[in-house]
């Protein structure tokens, strides 16, 4: 059986990659994917801890977090498509103002 510390280490690495993606990239789609990577890293850590200590309750919480993440993806991609249609760019610096 794989130790929990390996899962937590992998989760920390994935979360760090997500943070770097948010901080260093200017494309809104890449930033959106980095945020999703951070959310999935947190889910991985929660499942790893649940396997060792908490049991089924934490796995149910992860299921609901994944459900909320799916809704977030739907809304986020709809917003990105709408912004891209009006501004013709996905650059975060170019679309930072919300003027009509």
Curated annotation (Swiss-Prot):
Pfam families: Oxidored_q2 (PF00420). The keyword Repressor does not apply. InterPro entries: NADH_UbQ_OxRdtase_chain4L/K, NUOK/Mnh_C1-like. Its main location: membrane. It is a multi-pass membrane protein. Its EC number is 7.1.1.-. It is found in: Cell membrane. It is an enzyme of class 7 (translocase). It comes from the Bacteria. The chain crosses the membrane at residues 4-24, 29-49, 60-80. One of its GO terms (molecular function) is NADH:ubiquinone reductase (non-electrogenic) activity. It catalyses: a quinone + NADH + 5 H(+)(in) = a quinol + NAD(+) + 4 H(+)(out). Keywords: Cell membrane, Membrane, NAD, Quinone, Translocase, Transmembrane, Transmembrane helix, Transport, Ubiquinone. GO terms for cellular component: NADH dehydrogenase complex; plasma membrane. GO terms for biological process: ATP synthesis coupled electron transport. NDH-1 is composed of 14 different subunits. Subunits NuoA, H, J, K, L, M, N constitute the membrane sector of the complex. Belongs to the complex I subunit 4L family. NDH-1 shuttles electrons from NADH, via FMN and iron-sulfur (Fe-S) centers, to quinones in the respiratory chain. The immediate electron acceptor for the enzyme in this species is believed to be ubiquinone. Couples the redox reaction to proton translocation (for every two electrons transferred, four hydrogen ions are translocated across the cytoplasmic membrane), and thus conserves the redox energy in a proton gradient. This is NADH-quinone oxidoreductase subunit K. It comes from Chloroflexus aurantiacus (strain ATCC 29366 / DSM 635 / J-10-fl). The lineage of its organism: Bacteria, Bacillati, Chloroflexota, Chloroflexia, Chloroflexales.
């Amino acid at each position: 059986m794989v130790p929990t510390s390996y899962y937590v280490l992998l989760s920390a690495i994935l979360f760090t990659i997500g943070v770097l993606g948010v901080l260093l990239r200017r494309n809104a789609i890449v930033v959106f994917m980095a945020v999703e990577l951070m959310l999935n890293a947190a889910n991985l850590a929660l499942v790893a801890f649940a396997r060792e200590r908490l049991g089924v309750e934490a796995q149910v919480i992860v299921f609901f977090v994944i459900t909320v993440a799916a809704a977030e993806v739907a809304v986020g991609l709809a917003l990105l498509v709408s912004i891209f249609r009006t501004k013709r760019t996905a650059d975060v610096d170019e679309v930072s103002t919300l003027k009509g």
